[in-house]
Amino acid sequence: MCGIVGYTGKNSALTPVVDGLRKLEYRGYDSAGIALPTEIGKPLFIEKKAGKLKNLEDALAKTPNATSGIGHTRWATHGGPTDTNAHPHLDNEGKLALIHNGIIENYVQLRTELEKRGHKFKSETDTESVVHLLSDARKENNGDLAAAMRQVCKQLKGSFTLLAIHSDDPSHIVGARRNSPLVVGVGNGENFLASDVAAFIAHTKIALELGQDEVVEITPTSVEVTNLAGQVVKSKQYEISWDASAAERGGFPHFMLKEIYEQPKAIADTLIGRLDGLNVKIKFKKFEKIVIIACGTAYNAGLVGKYAIEKWGQIPVDVELASEYRYREPSLDKKTLVIPISQSGETMDTLMALRYAKSKGATIFSVCNTNGSTIGRESDAVLYTHAGPEIAVASTKAFATQLIAMYLIGLEIGKQLDHLSKKESKVIIEQLSALPAKVEQVLETVEPLRELTRKFKDSQSVLFLGRHVGYPTALEGALKLKELAYMHAEGFAGGELKHGPIALIDKGTPVVAIMPAEHSVLAEKMASNIQEVKARGAVVIAISEFDFIGADHLIRIPKTDQLLQPVLSVVPLQVIAYEMAVARGNDVDQPRNLAKSVTVE
């Protein structure tokens, strides 16, 4: 949530800052702004607009030149999405600008104290308290903005990424982070600060991640990181493995559709070098239970993981909503393995649950897509999914690779605990290896979904039914439709229909059914469920690996092991949600009210 960009160098700052904000649009926002020091010691040039980034760009048609600047896309938490509440915020002299991602929990107390000291506030935000506090601290530290930032961070409660710039020292930008991402881009005669490497990858592939409660000061030729005590921290640089073109649409009308079609490669990349074993220093024999913690789509991937790990590894698995987990004081200890799943590696609820589990002695083995992320760094081991950048807010290829990660972990546990024979492991490996090609096959057959889906664009409700691993797949299908089409959608286990949900069925209600493997007991059960809803007027769309004749519309997928079926059956569900959103005229890549990376609780 929120996008942050800072640039200082030899070139005009306007282009890299605005372009960087554009690359961060996927994070979700409702306003945008920029601050530029155009004259030393004079008030900063500032422009901010509610709405889309284009509103800001239109207002920047005649902007004075500056070689440094900071920019921000805001997701409203304190105060509505207005020009006034948009970032950056200024001190009373207009020389100091600050942008912020996160939530300052003690801002009311700070604001009250600052108002007593004569500070004038213009917005309703928690951020404005910080810029006034920083202004005072800078004066107390003889104009040293980095020292002032360290002082201020000690007074703040909550989570934050902060960036500040002052017109007295226009080439210096100071940043800080606590429980919220901030990364440095190290260039040649220019340096960057941003919430995500996507903001500056067109300019440099050398990055540096900040640790918890660290402060960074950049100039065009230097980067210095310190802790809150002022001690210099040696931060490790790394090279970004993907290129700028990966963040472009590549001829597709939307990022989401591009990412749906990138799934075969993402799956293959996640499997490479791992089918013979995971290179992690974890001995699974010491654990008595496993807890998977995640949110949203990652939670649904975790539910599938439970089936695989319990089947192949014969160890109990709980799947928990990260936002609820630590508040119920769960029982866990050194014999518990906790697996957090997060695409960004910065999901605040998941990070807080991870820290709670770690404090109780649990071992943390995380699944992330983003190298160098906070969750990855704070884990005992991490399995990176190699999905590449996922720009669309609604997750597709990240979900597919999270499923693959779950299977790889289940396979590793099964082998380590001797619950899988060499023959059984070989069959699983062969089935996993075949998945990229099978997803390609599914993608070749989804074109008819466009016309079919649009028939139901005005439906009041859509139900998704599944059994076994088809149930979490149904949950994911319903979530995608809610996110993108803004329609009421629910996912249910087929056997639960008669316990209440069947009351939702009316004439013409679309029901998407995920069929289990042919000739299985569950396939027979699902066929009965379908007859129940059809008898009440439902229109049934079945996703099946065999020619099921009981549906009104059939979407065929290739055969695979039942545990692996979600990788294939979810693809038509993603396409259904995408086409429904397009038919309803919605913003596919940036659905309303949603953010890609949820970095607040």
Identify the residue ranges that each predicted region occupies.
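Conserved short alpha-helical segments that host acidic/polar catalytic motifs at enzyme active sites
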Residues: 1-249, 253, 262-286, 300, ...
